[in-house]
Amino acid sequence: MTETISRNIIFIVIVLLLTALVVSNPSYAANSASSLGNVDSVLQNIVTMMTGTTAKLIAIICVAAVGIGWMSGFIDLRKAAYCILGIGIVFGAPTLVSTLMGSS
């Protein structure tokens, strides 16, 4: 009981400190026109991280592990297919979105 309360208090303190840090920084409010550029670059970095070389290598290892688990009987075929389908969706998302948006 007291451990849960102390965790909640620590969580609230951390959230308040992070909020104070973000609100107290004047650069966020100084130039609202360039703030979207910062958001765009952060989101682009996330997409690059999710579809980059390291992510592809991790996906290869995961597919191999799922295949071995399926052949050994530890993972059923449905869960293996969901894993492979999820990897395909993650790596196919940029192409799918650009196709739907009609990129020029």
UniProtKB/Swiss-Prot annotation:
Does Repressor show up as a keyword for this record? no
Residue ranges annotated as transmembrane are 57-77, 81-101
What membrane topology was assigned to this protein in its record?
Multi-pass membrane protein
Protein's cellular compartments: Cell outer membrane
- Known InterPro entries for this protein? TrbC/VirB2
Principal localization reads membrane
- The region annotated as signal peptide is 1-29
Q: Which domain of life is it from?
A: Bacteria
Record family assignment: Belongs to the virB2 family.
Task: Quote the subunit structure annotation.
Answer: Homooligomer (Potential). Interacts with the 17 kDa antigen protein that is encoded within the VirB locus.
Protein name as catalogued: Type IV secretion system protein virB2
Which gene is the coding source of this polypeptide chain?
virB2
